[in-house]
Amino acid sequence: MVPPSAASIDRFIDGVWIEDGLAALTLAAYRRDLSLYAAWLQAEHGLVLDQSSEAHLLGFMQQRHASSRATTANRRLTVFKRYFRWALRENIVRADPTVRLLAARQPLRVPKTLSEAQVEALLAAPDASTPRGLRDKAMMELMYASGLRVTELVQSRTVHLGLDEGVLQVQGKGARERLVPFGEEAHAWLQRYLLQARPQILAGQSSDDLFVTRHAKGMSRQMFWNLIKRYALAAGIQVPLSPHTLRHAFATHLLNHGADLRAVQMLLGHADIGTTTIYTHVARERLRQLHAKHHPRA
């Protein structure tokens, strides 16, 4: 028999997937957070998820997040709020215990990014005379040219690529589709990869994935992250990096060169322009640095 909490979580996950078309990774995170709380509630109080009170939720959050970052606590609270709103709508609970729970204040987290010179050094690091190096070069050029998320990059298929048009069809968060353009430099490297490197890597095998490994499968997020770290080391880049370093650089450099914020929002696939606004802080900080360095009265 399926435990009551697990059954409720399953129904909720199915519901939000149908309603919003959330990505598999997001659904997995929802399930993980709710299952963790349900297990705690059962162990500490002998209750199931739908018997939660505000006090129970506060106790869990205080116990689990006493020393963690506000962003982690807020993400989990968002999941709980969404679950109990759904449970109330479905008449599973009589009241929403999260109504009075407020998100913790958190500092503005500005994305780590690279200067244009550092990006050039990173993009020059792969040995494009080898099949794998050419593949890696094409991947990084495309990411910097289009601002793709890592998941969007590694999950791209050959049918999604419009090489002649210079666009890639992408399914982003929430199953939202968009067309992302890329420039001549990325086009040239993609063309070389498709004609020269990809057939050599596949060695007679077939694959629908755009960027392939020797096993004729797509690259994982972790594999691409390892590549970024390796090439950054080779390029002598010592600033903190993330898997989305080139995506952050794409947005910041566009804004530095006067791009419209709404246009950048569309290119990045952000549902809320508030998410894109964070990059304006990076751009302004860069302008302050340039002013301090070059203005005679700075």
Give residue ranges: language-model regions.
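Conserved catalytic core of the tyrosine transesterase superfamily
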Residues: M1-A298
